[in-house]
């Protein structure tokens, strides 16, 4: 540690360098951009010509083939860009490129629910560098995005508050830089697992923070430390609303990372992206899925994921629950505080949306050892069976369990109860549920009753009391 401090001090003592670019301004390698404990290596960003940032416009009229636009107003006027629509600008991260399928797939989901100008930013000329260099190139790309936003306002009358920047990884900090350069006038910035190395713990002027837009929300999916866990995302809160799905570190469906001993951040990405970065990539997959599942990513205000998992943060508060992803800006209390933390669980496959329920079961019948399961039936569909309790089943006992259904069942109409013995029981005992209450995350409770008991592996249907 002493050597690192000495190294940083010596770097900071060296006279800083500066580069200037037309319309974008000047960029220095002085602190806090370089020569600090968090950013020990001094570097200047590459030129706009070398980075070659491109803006790829998709609209409802051209969903499959982009139109290339620039910050020149004439190119925008000659495109399908509509000033009466919201503009969402998607910015990729390290090693990535603007023509990856995930960006256009996100646009296509938007077209299913809204009329929108969807611009994918391609800055692969600057992202496919060493990581330390790419973190400096972020500044130039952010300046170019800010220039585009300013031209939309000055030349086309399209206000910044109708612009939404969505950045993944380093792209989150590109969005933050653009927000700073437009003095927080941009309507919304969404950070999708904002990159940790060279940003965590740095001053706000270096990274994404809540002052960069009128509303900033963030999704954290790879928040374990970079060393030794190889977590690429920030654990630090950066927005008005910060969501930590599945606790924010290990996402369902992602294998444990066997490359966790690699510590050279300039070499960890190439060739390992799809495997090593599974948690990191989940953030944009969740966002894409949230667009077509407007109620499937409810976040619960909680002090920690452990407390959330202990069923102590249900149901939603008086203002409801914010939705992680596309509809986070619909939450009434979105900007009442900074760094509000929310937790939720997701699925492990392509359909990531989940709906949380609390089930309370009061048992009847005989005393046995076994486990009980419940399935929900509503006007929106039927859930699969979920285990509520396993152990000694006593008549009159009440068991409570929260679970995350892959189906929004809507208004509950009935429930089905089933139980199984843990051991062979020749007496063929009968067990039932005299009452089952189901609470949704909005606080509405549905009550169901039955006087019947059943043998194991026999369904018991309970109707509304």
UniProtKB/Swiss-Prot annotation:
Q: What protein does this entry describe?
A: Pancreatic triacylglycerol lipase
Q: Which GO terms describe its molecular function?
A: all-trans-retinyl-palmitate hydrolase, all-trans-retinol forming activity; lipase activity; lipoprotein lipase activity; metal ion binding; phospholipase A1 activity; retinyl-palmitate esterase activity; triacylglycerol lipase activity
Q: Which UniProt keywords apply?
A: Calcium, Disulfide bond, Hydrolase, Lipid degradation, Lipid metabolism, Metal-binding, Secreted, Signal
Q: Please name the InterPro entries in this protein's record.
A: AB_hydrolase_fold, Lipase, Lipase_LIPH, Lipase_N, Lipase_panc, PLAT/LH2_dom, PLAT/LH2_dom_sf, TAG_lipase
Gene source species: Rattus norvegicus
Family classification? Belongs to the AB hydrolase superfamily. Lipase family.
What does the record give as EC number? 3.1.1.3
Question: Which biological process terms from the Gene Ontology are attached to this UniProt entry?
Answer: cholesterol homeostasis; fatty acid biosynthetic process; high-density lipoprotein particle remodeling; intestinal cholesterol absorption; lipid metabolic process; post-embryonic development; response to lipid; response to peptide hormone
Positions of Ca(2+) binding = 204, 207, 209, 212
* Residue ranges constituting the PLAT domain according to the UniProt record: 355-465
Cite the active-site annotation. 169, 193, 280
What is the residue range of the signal peptide feature? 1-16
Annotated S-S bridges: 20-26, 107-118, 254-278, 302-313, 316-321, 449-465
Catalytic activity annotation: a triacylglycerol + H2O = a diacylglycerol + a fatty acid + H(+); 1,2,3-tri-(9Z-octadecenoyl)-glycerol + H2O = di-(9Z)-octadecenoylglycerol + (9Z)-octadecenoate + H(+); 1,2,3-tributanoylglycerol + H2O = dibutanoylglycerol + butanoate + H(+); all-trans-retinyl hexadecanoate + H2O = all-trans-retinol + hexadecanoate + H(+)
Classification of source organism = Eukaryota, Metazoa, Chordata, Craniata, Vertebrata
Indicate the principal place this protein occupies in or around the cell: secreted
Example of a GO cellular component annotation carried by this entry: extracellular space
- What is reported on the regulation of this protein's activity? Inhibited by bile salts, is reactivated by (pro)colipase/CLPS.
